[in-house]
Amino acid sequence: MRATHPLRLPTSCTLRRLSALATAVTLALTISSCSLREGTQSLAITSLNAQEADAAKPQDSISDMDNQPLSTASGLVTMSTSYVAGGTGSTAKEMATTVASRERSTDKFQWAVSIKPAVADQERTKYADNAQSAMSENMDRSSTGSAVVSPDGQYLSLILLPSEQQSGETAADLRTHIVVLDTKTGKTVRDVTVSGVTLGQALTNSALNVETAQNYFPAGSGKGTITIFSLTDTSAQPSSFPTDKWLVGATRENLMLAPSLLPDDCFSECSIMTTVSLLNTDGSTAGSISGVTAIHPGGWIHRFANPKAASDYQQRSKAASEDERKSLSPSREAAEEQLVNPSIKKTIDITGKRTFERGVPTGPGLLVDQKTPNGNGSTVLKPVFWLSSTDDGHPHTENLEQFENN
């Protein structure tokens, strides 16, 4: 989960927002108005050189909210957001996000763009006056949030802040821009506009997949819809299909859906399990995986190897007293955990280890740590191997020092 910091708003606007947050949201999802951006913004993407990108770095606290650097196939992408002048004839301040890519080892500038509206991170979404604000926590999800990288590291997709909602408008009236950038050049591959509440997005290696709804959930009155936008044929019309499940991630070629969202910060001792459905982009089922506890960027899935044994042990542990729980220990079957990559049919045993989402030289990846005796009677976490989302899935043991103290 990406770290965020509070947004500092003008005092008058802050008081009005605190009052608004105390008011229950109606089922119609109608919202009153007090906006970070006065008026409706059109999409504007401007290329920047190195000097312009450096000059765009904000001096205010808004930049503190931006995501940690994202690893791509071409380098590290950083984002910073600041207030900029509005459009022609406007005296209002608007927010824009500067997206910049630098070479991983040398920090050499590669490209940068300025995007308006700004990228919709958790805090900015939370304080927006529209139906999307209730989904602010979803914007920080690493696999389906406002900033995601494709498994091959070639594309970066960004959900932008939706327009201000006027009094009387409903969730169906909400309009949100989503922009996909080529991570090598910074060029816009595709920009789309979706309607309704945006529940999440995910990238395969060839498509942008967006889940929207008419409520804060896909089932029932939410009337969830997944829309697929091709990134290889950008002139192609999007396709869509209805769903009552949550979009939780994507492999290289399939979507991953689940009955409910999983915790986004499960690194060890994960207990909530679900079954994830693998879907083709036409909505047909490609398979399923049970015992899933976490979905990671790049298509890696964390699961219990024996879901029934793991569930039985968890139930016994919950029913036991505190003293009884101290003497309980799971069987090998109940404790065995795996990382699975369906695209390459790769399964790796990680029993007794911990996984962390880390940028690796090829793009999104995972670091696997294990407790190791330090010689002083205690243990320390040491990197064991790292995984890429672009190769054959073999554990990498080279250059582990890059993860020390990181």
Residue ranges of each PLM-predicted region?
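Sec-dependent bacterial lipoprotein signal peptides
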Residues: M1-S32
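N-terminal "mature head" segments of proteins
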Residues: L21-S142, V148, G377-T379, F385-N405
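Hydrophilic extracytoplasmic domains
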Residues: V25, L36-G39, A56-S80, H296-N406
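A short beta-strand motif characteristic of beta-propeller blades
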Residues: E52-S61, F109-V113, N130-E137, K187-T193, ...
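Repeated scaffold domains used in trafficking and secretory/extracellular systems
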Residues: S61-T72, A118-D129, M139-V148, T193-S206, ...
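Structural core positions within WD40/WD-like beta-propeller blades
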Residues: V77-S80, V84-A85, S150, Y155-S157, ...
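Short, solvent-exposed loop/turn segments at conserved positions within beta-propeller repeat blades
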Residues: S90-M95, S167-T176, Y216-G224, D264-M273, ...
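Short loop/turn segments that connect beta-strands within beta-propeller blades
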Residues: R104-T106, D182-G186, S230-T234, N280-D282, ...
